[in-house]
Amino acid sequence: MKLAVYGKGGIGKSTTSCNISIALAKRGKKVLQIGCDPKSDSTFTLTGFLIPTIIDTLQAKDYHYEDVWPEDVIYQGYAGVDCVEAGGPPAGAGCGGYVVGETVKLLKEFNAFYEYDVILFDVLGDVVCGGFAAPLNYADYCIIVTDNGFDALFAANRITASVREKARTHPLRLAGLIGNRTKKRDLIEKYVETCPMPILEVLPLIEDIRVSRVKGKTLFEMTESEPTLQFVCDFYLNIADQLLTQPEGVIPRELGDRELFNLLSNFYLNSSNSTNTTLKNETNLFDLV
């Protein structure tokens, strides 16, 4: 099974990806996580350091694939999850899709691309140009990480359009949305009501999720010294269990930008007005007492 994780930049894709990878490993699967971001920090919380990228390694070997060995680019992280960082082209030049293609090509040279139960692509931000949509060419499922905000849902909608387009020529489905670190889920639910798709999980606003990134550890590793965090790990285990059932998934239908803006803004404004009216009525009742 091959997964591609997308979402707005800074939404917590890498943190989510690393914890899902471990959850899948905890369920007995052999997992490879491939970071597809020029920052090359997707697997940081799995390994505890920034591993060499495939592109940097190939450049050092003058692109002689026969001189590159699996141990040069594949590093084992926490819970036995194997890690690869694709790297990226020089700033302002090249294409991220080419980098992903070179990564897959090299892994196939090692016969490694097919020896894993699960391969998870953690992909740069919300860029859905042909290049950074390249991991969708290899994926069985796309997962979108979002929160309950306008910007993240706009990004999710654009990614949804990319999934629909790729599904025309590839056996790709959207597994669903993951809400990350959010107090509410009303905007997410409103969006899903209009564009039907599964919600795999909504993680609460827990500071330890963000702190884990700073510490260079996953929630699972932090739980070893802080057992009270086990309930957070259970969210990721639930996501893993859903994915391992190989869900049918959906070919989503995105909204137009203006349509989405009107949907979310009207819902938000109506909710705010309703809250204000309720507060005003409660104040009037208090005055009567």
Curated annotation (Swiss-Prot):
Transmembrane segments: none annotated. It comes from the Eukaryota. Component of the dark-operative protochlorophyllide reductase (DPOR) that uses Mg-ATP and reduced ferredoxin to reduce ring D of protochlorophyllide (Pchlide) to form chlorophyllide a (Chlide). This reaction is light-independent. The L component serves as a unique electron donor to the NB-component of the complex, and binds Mg-ATP. Belongs to the NifH/BchL/ChlL family. Keywords: 4Fe-4S, ATP-binding, Chlorophyll biosynthesis, Chloroplast, Iron, Iron-sulfur, Magnesium, Metal-binding, Nucleotide-binding, Oxidoreductase, Photosynthesis, Plastid. [4Fe-4S] cluster binds at C95, C129. It comes from Tetradesmus obliquus (Green alga). It catalyses: chlorophyllide a + oxidized 2[4Fe-4S]-[ferredoxin] + 2 ADP + 2 phosphate = protochlorophyllide a + reduced 2[4Fe-4S]-[ferredoxin] + 2 ATP + 2 H2O. This is Light-independent protochlorophyllide reductase iron-sulfur ATP-binding protein.
